């Protein structure tokens, strides 16, 4: 008799028709909360409605129901993204000069928005070249369309329609997977299956599909565009896909088909899968054959990774086992218990994902200029500045969000009884040592980095330039950064013998790429000025981390308030009769962290903007002489606070301040308006709730006198609401001011 192991049964992981689709319910504001569903009696109701609408934890304690709501909301988010993308492509098709730009990208600027002539607003349509009047755009869409092989506005229309179809699909999926077939909790907690599918499906097959598109569509079309062929003469994408001979004319190895692949002569394919390094001198972008090779390699890596985790077949890794085996000699129980946290707390999961995504976004910001991936991106200075700034802000916000959700996890989901002597418990137990050391590091960095500037300002004021820290007096060279640069310059000869240039021209080595007389990229030398400002970066980043980490580590308890966990994530003070306990909630740490994040990112984007204008961006004469936009003044001017104020903020604000009467005038108005929004925030941040309540009561008295009193009783914002409104306007005003300042400047001079 043979004993067979039981066949693994297919688990039913969805529930049919769990929640009725009800339009009556949707039409009732606050239907998710018994208190809010009663309707407003005071004006606080509308604030609570906004605060709690997406706080699914407050609607129900059922983890499965919360998971389904989050899952469904993700489809809604994707639908919005597809609609937004579709709108971008539609603007490119309907209102843009894309085809003209494609024919002459060095002289014509990208525009995809034309302002209607209402009361003189046609002034906003500037001349972007080729007889086209419109607003110059700085999003980089034209460059990415060129790289993907889009040659006509019809193709943009088609893609826009495709985007809308996908948006509709996503909206349907969001409804279907909540109301018709909702996954059970076990499905959300099946991490191995999720890893396999996300790694192999999204990243693996996604990269493979993109690599395929690049090889069969982008490469041939870009090859012909680079050779100066008129876009209208170039075959359509499907012709390259269906007709191999067309491709073989450009890349001879296509004639051999798949033979080299199966005979392992992969080097035959090196005409379209290259490893060159550096930039294409025609477009100033990375070699598209390099990026196709890159995406193919990424696809292979992730397809392998997507087969590593144990599911129905009993082979492969188990995440729980990996975590529990992860112990060191000094780390107690190690990662034991973390698996349970990450499968039952979506806040913990989100915190990790936000921290990693934010860091990745900041890495993207730095690679977009140093390794410009799309054709003609590097000579479009306005777009370069916009993309860097955008990715830095996004990364900053995302990292603060990581701390916010880590703190929410600590307050709502952390169970101290199941976390004994593992790494999380050990970190929490020596949090005082961590925070006090970090605080010391912040004080040290703050005094020393700022002190170097103050020294320079003082010596400058006393007329003693020889006693300043500068490249021409007392040098503080960033020797470690220079060493890193140098090793990368040597890499092509040593570690990558087939590469013709290093990964980025910024490392050094003397190569300069200019396109149409404009510098695309050249070696960036670092000196005393960079050393000084990098220590300001270190200071602001450490203070941001100090505030956020303190908020997380002290979210549940502190010496001041031992029972903080009972008060929740956000609360104004620990009740009456306990003075000095205000602004200690985890939420308040996020609130304060946002201001320091704003400080940190502001210094970074100011540094980038000035450094690039001074040392990289500019024009190349026929004699080979480079003239930079601000003539290399960064090294000597940015070493004093006064230099930053005078030669960066004031000197470069000339364009936005004098923009009236030109096509940049909208930026002048934005600059003023955003300053106003920023100042408006101070009214919320510097004023107490009682002041407003008193004012409101006297205004209500006047309304009563006139018998026009409202049915909904007006109330001053709560302390937390006031701070939330304050920080929102502070950041919006500050970011929009910077945006207007940057764009008016760089569009005028770039």
From Swiss-Prot:
Its EC number is 1.97.1.12. Chlorophyll a' binds at residue 675. It is a multi-pass membrane protein. Keywords: 4Fe-4S, Chlorophyll, Chloroplast, Chromophore, Electron transport, Iron, Iron-sulfur, Magnesium, Membrane, Metal-binding, Oxidoreductase, Photosynthesis, Photosystem I, Plastid, Thylakoid, Transmembrane, Transmembrane helix, Transport. [4Fe-4S] cluster binds at residues 573, 582. P700 is a chlorophyll a/chlorophyll a' dimer, A0 is one or more chlorophyll a, A1 is one or both phylloquinones and FX is a shared 4Fe-4S iron-sulfur center. The chain crosses the membrane at residues 70-93, 156-179, 195-219, 291-309, 346-369, 385-411, 433-455, 531-549, 589-610, 664-686, 724-744. Gene3D superfamilies: Photosystem I PsaA/PsaB. GO terms for biological process: photosynthesis. It is found in: Plastid, Chloroplast thylakoid membrane. GO terms for molecular function: 4 iron, 4 sulfur cluster binding; chlorophyll binding; electron transfer activity; magnesium ion binding; oxidoreductase activity. Belongs to the PsaA/PsaB family. PANTHER family: OUTER MEMBRANE PROTEIN, OMPA-RELATED, PHOTOSYSTEM I P700 CHLOROPHYLL A APOPROTEIN A1-RELATED. This is Photosystem I P700 chlorophyll a apoprotein A1.
